[in-house]
A protein has these predicted regions:
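Short, positively charged and aromatic/hydrophobic N-terminal segments
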Residues: 10, 18, 31, 69-70, ...
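Polybasic, lysine-rich low-complexity intrinsically disordered segments
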Residues: 24-28
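Serine/threonine-rich, low-complexity intrinsically disordered segments
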Residues: 3, 20-22, 45, 59, ...
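Feature captures the catalytic ectodomains and active-site-proximal regions of enzymes
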Residues: 75-509
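Short, positively charged low-complexity motifs
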Residues: 1-2, 7-14, 37-39, 48, ...
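Extended rod-forming repeat segments used as scaffolds/tethers
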Residues: 13, 19-22, 38, 44-46, ...
């Protein structure tokens, strides 16, 4: 709480609306803070001795940590300290189902997380269907929704996001794919879809990049861990092809096929119909060409990888070799209205995962590369926290993404999931004094028992000035279901945050 004489501002604020309303009418309405600092008696401010005390008090509040004036309204905070700052923390795959080994509790309920619980006590909680009830989200569609974009309207495939996040400058007509380094045995059966979660893949990527085929240019790049991206560039190629990833072990990689069927009838004589059929035939021809290119590329990559010194050494150590590439998620670059243009706030992304960085980059947000951020359970969270605080100086909205909980969920590792939750909680106290609003949620559930994404809703908490608090005292899936926020969709989260920040626009007259 504010200390006297700072608390006098609450009884003397009746002088301020006159000044603020007049300042708002100026062309440079966002420069309120500069006007307060440079002008001891701002234009229109009442000529009363008490006014100077209010001004002095406002300056004292601006110099104080943000947590000390959390009881004030959002609009007043904006007036006193400048632009409102929001931090959205996304713990990838953090939500879970109850586990018998944990006395039918979830990892989030077992984890020691005093900071998340503190946010729940002073904020509003709820549960969220990132896409829709009963729909298990991919990480790509989930992050589109969490940034306020409708994935049903904007999603064109995972590949473009992976490529953009890997630093590849995509051109019109490029087709991008997500790739997994995987392990196959001598019978071409997939024994590990992630090649033992291999991390050092740069040498492998360099070898694969040397593959040349007629018909298209291949751009291959490793991203984080077992992940990579592949871009096809050239004429007459298509994203309308199937995946080679069987999405489970014990099966052979799938043959990539065109998704368009061969037309069985001859072209009709009617010009309009014939034109449509000819276009379909052309699309099908391009898809067939692309499928053949990808199958040939996969075969050549397998021959290169199984003989590579890195994999020979892994076999000697008893580790699964990264001797095959599973290709999936082909797509073209989507058109996204820039985040700042759409919502009126300047956004920044602090993440290691190429997918998340790519979504944010294509949305026009600033993307920060953090040394030590691995996109795994061993990521350097303190380095990420430092990057968040640095970017808060120049951005209104920061998205902090942490991948580790999802990885632990896919591996069925209860201990690792609890540990990463506790590590994320430990850095939250670094943000309390630098952000007005702090939001914590997950992009989807990755239950230990399923080892994959499910449609279970995820918990969300929003804490900050002016938020209607509820009776929830802890942060978990079970507790959040009783919260005042109710049950929302992923694409509703940003509009709710924007409204709390005082930047929403009225719908209607």
């Amino acid at each position: 709480m504010l200390q006297a004489p700072e608390a006098r501002v609450l009884s003397e604020l009746d002088y301020r609306p006159i000044a603020i309303s007049r300042l708002k009418n100026k062309k440079n309405s966002l420069n309120w803070r500069a006007r307060w600092d440079l002008n001891p008696r701002p234009t229109g401010f009442p000529h009363k001795p008490e006014a100077l005390r209010v001004l002095s008090t406002c300056r004292a509040i601006r110099a104080a940590p943000r947590a000390r004036y959390s009881f004030l309204s959002t609009r007043l905070v904006c007036i006193l300290v400048g632009e409102v700052k929001t931090l959205l923390i996304i713990c990838d795959g953090m939500a879970d189902r109850t586990i018998p080994a944990l006395a039918y509790k979830t990892p989030l309920e077992i984890a020691k997380k005093p900071n998340m619980d503190w946010l729940a006590k002073r904020g509003i909680s709820g549960i969220m269907d990132t896409i829709a009830p009963g729909t298990a989200p991919g990480s790509d569609t989930a992050h589109l929704a969490l940034l306020g974009y409708d994935p049903y309207e904007t999603y064109t495939g995972r590949g473009p996001f992976e490529a953009a996040g890997a630093g590849i400058e995509l051109r019109p007509g490029d087709i991008a794919f997500r790739v997994n380094y995987a392990t196959v045995d001598k019978n071409m059966i997939v024994t590990d879809r992630r090649a033992g979660r291999i991390h050092d893949t740069e040498a492998l990527a360099e070898a694969v990049q040397k593959i040349k085929l007629k018909g298209a240019e291949f751009i291959f790049k490793s991203t984080v861990g077992h992940r990579a991206t592949l871009v096809l560039r050239g004429k007459g190629i298509s994203h309308e092809v199937s995946d080679s990833d069987p999405h489970e072990e014990g099966k052979r990689p799938l043959k990539i096929e065109p998704l368009l069927q061969e037309p069985e009838q001859k072209l009709p004589s009617y010009p309009i119909i014939a034109g449509g059929v000819r276009k379909y035939v052309m699309r099908r021809r391009w898809a067939a060409k692309t499928a053949k290119l990808l199958n040939d590329f996969s075969q050549k990559a397998h021959e290169v990888l199984k003989k590579h010194p890195v994999n020979i050494e892994r076999v000697k150590k008893g580790l699964p070799p990264a001797n095959y590439l599973l290709i999936r998620g082909g797509g073209v670059v989507p058109h996204l209205v820039p985040f700042q243009e759409r919502f009126g706030i300047k956004g920044c992304c602090v993440a290691a995962a190429a997918l998340v960085k790519g979504v944010c980059k294509l949305a026009g947000m600033t993307v920060v590369d953090v040394p030590g951020a691995t996109g795994s359970v061993n990521t350097d969270l303190n380095a990420k926290a430092k990057a968040v605080l640095e970017q808060a100086q120049s951005h209104d909205f920061i998205l902090l993404h942490v991948k580790g909980a999802d990885e632990a969920g896919h591996d069925g590792n209860i201990k690792a999931k609890i540990e990463i939750i506790e590590r994320v909680d430990a850095i939250i106290n670094q943000f309390i004094d630098s952000f007005d609003f702090i939001v914590v949620t997950a992009d989807h559930s990755t239950p230990i028992s399923v080892k994959n994404h499910t449609a279970d809703p995820v918990p969300v908490v929003i804490s900050g000035p002016g938020v209607r608090t509820d009776d929830v005292k802890t942060y978990s899936e079970r507790a959040a279901a009783r919260g005042g926020l109710g049950r929302i969709r992923g694409k509703d989260l940003i509009p709710i945050i924007i409204d709390l920040m005082g930047k929403s626009r009225k719908f209607g007259a």
